[in-house]
Amino acid sequence: MLPLLGLCFALPLCAGLLEEARSWEDTSDQVGLRIPRQVRLLQRLKTKPLMTEFSVKSTIISRYAFTTVACRMLNRGSEDQEVTFQMQIPAAAFITNFTALIGDKVYQGEITEREKRNGDKVKEKRNKTIEDNGEKGTETFRASAVLPSKDKAAFLLSYEELLQRRLGKYEHVVSVRPQQLVGRLTVEVTVLERPGIAELEVLGLQNSRQRGSGRGPDDSGPPPSTVINQNETFAKVVFKPSVVQQAKIAQNGILGDFIVRYDVNREQSIGDIQVLDGYFVHYFAPKDLPPLPKNVVFVLDSSASMVGTKLRQTKDALFTILHDLRPQDHFNIVGFSNRIKVWKDHLVSVTPNSIRDGKVYIHHMSPSGGTDINGALQRGIQLLNDYVAHNDIEDRSVSLVVFLTDGKPTVGETHTFKILNNTREATRGRVCIFTVGIGADVDFKLLEKLSLENCGLTRRVHEDHDARAQLIGFYDEIRTPLLSDIRVDYPPSLVERATRTLFPNYFNGSEIVIAGKLVDRAMDRLHVEVTASNSKKFVVLKKDVPVEPRKVGIDVSQSPRPRGRGQEEPNHLERLWSYLTLKELLSAWLQSIEEPERERLRQEAQALAVNHHFLIPFTSMTLKSAPRTEAPEAAYGMSSTSMATGPETVMQSLRGTHLQPGPAVKKPYNPRIKISKTSADGDPHFVVDFPLSNLTVCFNIDGEPGHILRLVSDHADSGVTVNGELIGAPAPPNGHKKQRTYFRTITILVNKPERSYLEITPSRVIVDGGDRLVLPCNQSAVVGRRGLEVSVSANASVTISIQGTVAFVVLLHLYKKPAPYQRNHLGFYIANGQGLSSNCHGLLGQFLNQEARLIGLSKSPAHPPVPEAGERSEAVLEVKGRQVPVVWKQRRIYNGEEQVDCWFARNNAAGLIDGEYKGYLAAHPFDSETAFGPGLSQGL
């Protein structure tokens, strides 16, 4: 019997679109009735299920966020209990996967087409258990299961979203509400932005449903235990509070929203265009332009339901908003209940007197009567149309209605279809309507359609202490229009399936995003043309953008389903394109009137969502039991010895239903591969073997903690890149160094025959090739897929074999009781480099196919003279036409098991390596675009 009691999905679409969520099993008829007193007694004696771990990991690449939530629970009681996993997700996000591990059974979510009920249309109502806070809010995902006594469960949820730029910032919000104190709680947010991260801030935990106006910096600072590591293009934020720190924030486990805000560097031209594997995205966000004049009518609900806090906070917000109007703007105010009351019979210019009089009018508004939404909108739009028609306006301007209500139409025209039709005919595409719904009783679906059909936005504002700030924040998003009538054109012969390219307005601090597919992946340039209207002129921007499909940073594959033969590995730009396309199809379906058109849009969205594994109102998710396995936790990246071993051993991302436990993890064995001398180990000490010259050379690299060194770079030919990240440690007493550095992470990017990522630390190995698998280093295991094999020898080494022609060995240096100057670290050895090309580069890779010789040395260079006490043996090494002074040394490798005689090059291998040491620094762990010395470059 499937033990899941119920599963509620919060689908990321406008209010009114979600079909009632389904439960996989109804067990209500199986629960025996008890005497009420007996129930209360049993509840008192029950031991609540313990959450042993709550982990959220997000990776944001080019504003597109992949998030995976992992939760582990333990039933400590003596009887079966129901456990519930609950997570708030952004309303704009799409769920891509859900997996439950109950005991030794695995249940995996599968996205399929949702059948139309009664053969007509999707029900336009929401499950009452789903919290819907509108476009800027959250929806809650819930899953329940019966967990046997003393057994363990794990839930894993994945979702994706495109971050929207508002008020000049991108905001990524993670809900941290495990409902109890958790022994292992981790939130990890990684940001990768090719243009560079302009600024990044972590706000204090917030429990308000919406977050104020955004005016001025948040001075609360990041929550305790937050660690931020950042360079120009990469940032990693980790929040890992202890139980004591959690209790100081909230003893009930409802910590709040963990918020990361950032922006990116921008070029003042056509915008930022990124290309990857036949897909492109175009970000356009100009600034430093003169603002367009606004013609704005504020239409405010003053019906009886607005009495009290709602009307008071609305008035306070409008007082601030009126002060922000510019001298070139014009405005008017309409109050409505069952009667329509207009402040002036025409729009007035912004002056100190008009602002004062407008505030007085708002102050005297009092709640009474019903709600005539249709009449109020018609009057507001008429005021704008009359102003534009009867005034000779020299400058271009934008006409806006800001409409605010807390209820449903109760007076005048109350039929939704007629209100929408009347509004559409009145605006005629020349007036944009921005709607705000206050409180829980508002007809949010109507407001959303009004905005969608009339080039506006909609927000839901909650009736709480910060409603005033929410209103001001919404107005701030539209207070500064910079461009109108924006059109973006690409050559039709080069681009297909582009998303929306026409935009009525562009507001300061926002961003226009377009994604599409390229007809020819081999093209080297893309012509882009942007036309728009500014306050006094018509703007035309043209540019031929170089298309460099391999220079976009890393590609985090999110393949949600088994790929057939010939299918390429999906990439984040393909996911972004499908996400935007789905959003536009769903919006078009919402606005469509004709049933044939609605059915066409439904089928197109449904096919795209199933193909890319997105949960939308036209698809459904069913849980299917995966094949039984001896160690299902290990197959999903979890420790089989303990369900509370930490987030490091949890599978970080579910990429689809094709990950099945069993075949991926084989019986462990101890690999026996002969390791060459060519290596980077210790502090870090580099050893290079020149087999063609029967010579060994060594050198040191004095890096800084956090530096990422390029070790092997053959991305263009064999498709292999290896980077190593350094960690710092104090030097031993009486040493000549102030600090030492070691490798704490080795990352390997394999691009052929298909893309795979490996991340190796002393505690875990992450293998990500569409299926993401996490292997603990304290357990032996072997995994393999399509030419890539990874073997873990417990607490000793990790061996990576690629296509049978390339092999690397990573040694694990672990300390049971480390001294202050000791750190667990890694050593990297090239076991087999036959499959690497002659163009291979990097600190180690550049020497694999080179010859070297010693000049003026009579004895065999392979066996340097053993110097007598106090004597130094020196020589000159010739490599690549360069002569480098070297001195004879001895090095220990393979955990000190073997001693190597080598010729040592000083000064960070100056003259030995191409260029300088700094040319080998990577921007992020999976970066494959780094210059190596003067004029040398290897790119993605």
Swiss-Prot record:
GO terms for cellular component: extracellular region. CDD domains: vWA_interalpha_trypsin_inhibitor. PROSITE patterns: VIT (PS51468), VWFA (PS50234). It is found in: Secreted. GO terms for molecular function: serine-type endopeptidase inhibitor activity. Its main location: secreted. Glycans are attached at residues 97, 127, 231, 421, 508, 694, 778, 795. One of its GO terms (biological process) is hyaluronan metabolic process. Residues 1-16 form the signal peptide. Keywords: Glycoprotein, Protease inhibitor, Secreted, Serine protease inhibitor, Signal. Residues 295-478 form the VWFA domain. Residues 35-161 form the VIT domain. It comes from the Eukaryota. Residues 207-227 are annotated as: Disordered. Belongs to the ITIH family. May act as a tumor suppressor. This is Inter-alpha-trypsin inhibitor heavy chain H5. It comes from Bos taurus. The gene is ITIH5.
